[in-house]
């Protein structure tokens, strides 16, 4: 379990590598509410979402693309969102996306760590691209999973 600030430090390092690969084709913007800095966040929660945005949204796009990462407090919850202006998907395929490895692993981790105290949504913003939003309890650490539990969950 990391604090949101440490998770973002890791994410910024990952983004720097991707920006070196994509050069001028990739812009990533962070809009982080300072009130969320001490919120506990599971390790590597956002990286797979940003990776999906870059790989499946921006990568196939012919021109430059943008990814936005936001964190803000909504009531008693921390709302994290990764949104891109990439190629997006048809409405009929939206539910299929949640069964991809990155999104399904993230959804499973959230269910294991927070039970019904989380929300995970994938939407198509009106301006295009894709958005993934996560809401988790702001001041309540997630249930820690042992390595054996995580391995068993991955095998299921």
Predicted regions mapped to residue ranges:
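Two-component histidine phosphotransfer core
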Residues: 1-123, 130-133
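C-terminal end segment of the histidine kinase catalytic
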Residues: 125-156
């Amino acid at each position: 379990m990391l604090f949101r600030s440490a998770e973002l430090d890791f994410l910024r390092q990952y983004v720097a590598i991707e920006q070196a690969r994509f050069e001028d084709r990739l812009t990533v913007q962070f809009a982080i509410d300072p009130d969320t800095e001490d919120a506990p966040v599971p390790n590597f929660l956002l990286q797979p979402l940003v990776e999906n945005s870059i790989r499946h949204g921006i990568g196939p796009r012919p021109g430059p693309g943008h990814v936005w990462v936001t964190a803000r407090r909504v009531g008693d919850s921390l709302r994290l969102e990764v949104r891109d202006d990439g190629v997006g998907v048809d409405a009929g395929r939206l539910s299929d996306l949640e069964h991809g490895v990155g999104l399904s692993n993230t959804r499973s981790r959230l269910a294991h760590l927070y039970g019904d105290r989380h929300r995970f949504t994938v939407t198509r913003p009106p301006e295009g691209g894709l958005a993934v939003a996560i809401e988790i309890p702001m001041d309540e650490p997630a249930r820690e999973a042992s390595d054996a539990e995580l391995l068993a969950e991955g095998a299921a």
